[in-house]
Structure formats: structure tokens, C-alpha cells
């Protein structure tokens, strides 16, 4: 199969879809025509020469990379890339379609095969291609929150873990999944007073077994969220409903109840965010804004700030699926691997992921009707 790897052009997105090691795996499987856009790996400290040595057939400009049968990317395409779409093209990347009507319509109009990393789902409910970036984003969220609590960044001027004679500060993590758990790990490591809120009693028990007395757990309901947010210095939003818009769990009134200089980090912003005051997506160039005295961090591609780590972690997880698609074609690969089939969000001009269709009020077609 002819495979293209374009350079990411989203603001400060320094990741690349495949490491040179991943390219070796593809070329050894017989997929020798890999079009790597010139400079695509530089942000992750991979040189063009490394890709050529790994077996990439040639380096190219973006248009040529996009002209291949399967496109491997990291982030969802931006508007300037929609013109590269064509019927039957396979796009394998993070899509996050629920809040992105224009991209969704472009995939429908061009009849692109849109396979989203974030909705590839194993039988046990886990999301293997979202997990590595959730780990990164979760760990970053607490680090970033601690930074913006510093006075010179607009925060209260406090240290999360306190020091001798000064009490630790309060961190609330809403969502106890992969991202939330990793945010809590870093907060505990910093010595903060940590609360994790989740909807699942079973998950809360798992977190208590994991953290012991280092973390307090609470059931997710409006009262518990309001009380915990009110008394928190840092709130991390880490709720995920696969493929769907994030629920608005923290109201504007809750944000107003926080002390000035408090910080919220919305990991879920790429799905619309969980804070009612998350009314914009920010960038690494301009990552925060202040509303009701609270610093809001709403960067949708957080792992792009640590691209070397993120690219390696992403490739480790995506390469088995990319190989299945390249070796068998997407239809047979999806028939053989139900987890991969759940990643198909757009196919033959239809939306085939129910949560996306519901979020945008579009007709839903079961993917099984199109892949047999």
C-alpha cells in the first residue's frame, strides 16, 4: 500500500505520525512507497536522513504525501488540508469529530475512510490508541497547572506540595480514567492534597487500591463537584466519552466560586471541554486566558509540547493497526479486528460512529452495513 505521512501544521504540533523505527516495520512488510513530507519529523528530533535510512522511498512536499492511499497523521486535518481529500482515501489519525462539523462534512463530501485513533476500542472497553497520549496529557496537566499557579504566570503564587510549616494545596481531578489517573499520580508526587471524582464506584475502588490514603475519591454528582471545585487551587478536567462531546460538568457558577488565581486545565477540550467557561481552544503560543479570575488552560494538543516522548509512544501503539490496514486493506482488517472497526467514524459518505452522528444531528449508518 502507498502510505503518506504529512508534516503536522497545527499550531506548535511537533509530533509526527511515525518514527523511523515504525517506517522500518512498514517497509519490511513490503510497503516500500512511503512518502514522508520533508521536515516532518524535525519537531520530534527525527531527521529526514533517518527516515531515508529507515527505508522511506522518498521525501516530498505536503501535496505528494497527501496523494497516497493511506495517510498517517497525529492531529485532525485543518481546513487548508481538506482539499487533499479524495474518495476512498484512508485517513488514520486522531479525528475528534464530535465538535468539528466542518471536518466531518468534508469527510462525508469527499467519501474519505476516516479511522479515528481515539475510538479504536478493545472488547474490555479500553482505548489502546488514546491511552498513550492520555498518559502524557495527564502527567502534563498537573505540571502545567503547578506552573500557572505561580504568581508570574497569573496564579495565586503557591506551591502545590507546600513546604515545612505550610500546608499542601488542593487538586481536584474530574475523571478517573487514564488521563485523570496520571494527573493524580503527578499531583500526589508533588505532595498535593488530591481528590479524584468519577462516575464509576468500581473505578473509585480501583483508585483507592492504587493510591491508598494519598487520594480521596468522590462520586461524580453536581454537589460533590461544586464543593470540591470551590475549595480547589487546581482543577483538572479529564472526562472522556469515546467519540462524543465532553459533558459540561463544571458550571460557570462553580468557576466563580473559586479563589482568584486558581487554575483549571481542560484535557477534554479537544472534545469540547468539561468546563462551562471553556469557551475557546487555546494554543501553545497563547495557552491561557482568565475568566472570573481563574486561569484557564485549554490547549487541545498538549502532548505536542513533548513531541519526542509522544511520537515514540504513539508509534508503539499505532504501528500494529497501521500494518493490519496496509497488509489487508481497511475492510478485511476491520473484519478481522473488531477493535479497529470501532475506529471507523466516516465511510462512503456516511457517519458510522453513533456518538459523532448524535453530536452533530447527522444520520447514522452502522459500519457493519458497509463492511461485510
Curated annotation (Swiss-Prot):
GO CC list: cytosol; plasma membrane
Catalytic activity: L-alanine + NAD(+) + H2O = pyruvate + NH4(+) + NADH + H(+)
GO MF annotation terms: alanine dehydrogenase activity; nucleotide binding
Residues that coordinate or bind substrate: 15, 75
pH effect on activity, per entry: Optimum pH is 10.0-10.5 for the oxidative deamination of L-alanine and about 9.0 for reductive amination of pyruvate.
Gene name of this polypeptide: ald
Activity's thermal dependence: Loses about 50% of its initial activity when heated at 65 degrees Celsius for 5 minutes.
UniProt-listed GO biological process terms: alanine catabolic process; L-alanine catabolic process; sporulation resulting in formation of a cellular spore
Designated name of the protein: Alanine dehydrogenase
Location(s) in or outside the cell: Cytoplasm
EC code(s) of this entry: 1.4.1.1
Source species, domain of life: Bacteria
Modes of activity regulation: Inhibited by p-chloromercuribenzoate and HgCl(2) and by Cu(2+) and Pb(2+) salts, unaffected by amino acids such as D-alanine and beta-alanine or by nucleotides or nucleosides.
InterPro entries in the cross-refs: Ala_DH, Ala_DH/PNT_CS2, AlaDH/PNT_CS1, AlaDH/PNT_N, AlaDH/PNT_NAD(H)-bd, NAD(P)-bd_dom_sf
Record function comment: Catalyzes the reversible reductive amination of pyruvate to L-alanine. Prefers L-alanine for oxidative deamination, other substrates are poorly reactive. In the other direction 2-oxobutyrate is almost as reactive as pyruvate. Ammonia is the sole amino donor for the reductive amination of pyruvate, NADPH is inert. Reductive amination proceeds through a sequential, ordered ternary-binary mechanism, where NADH binds first followed by ammonia and pyruvate; the products are released in the order L-alanine and NAD(+).
Family the entry assigns: Belongs to the AlaDH/PNT family.
Active site: 96, 270
Any Pfam family the entry gives: AlaDh_PNT_C
Location (main, coarse): cytoplasm
Family annotation (NCBIfam families): alaDH (TIGR00518)
Organism annotation: Lysinibacillus sphaericus
Signal peptide feature range: none
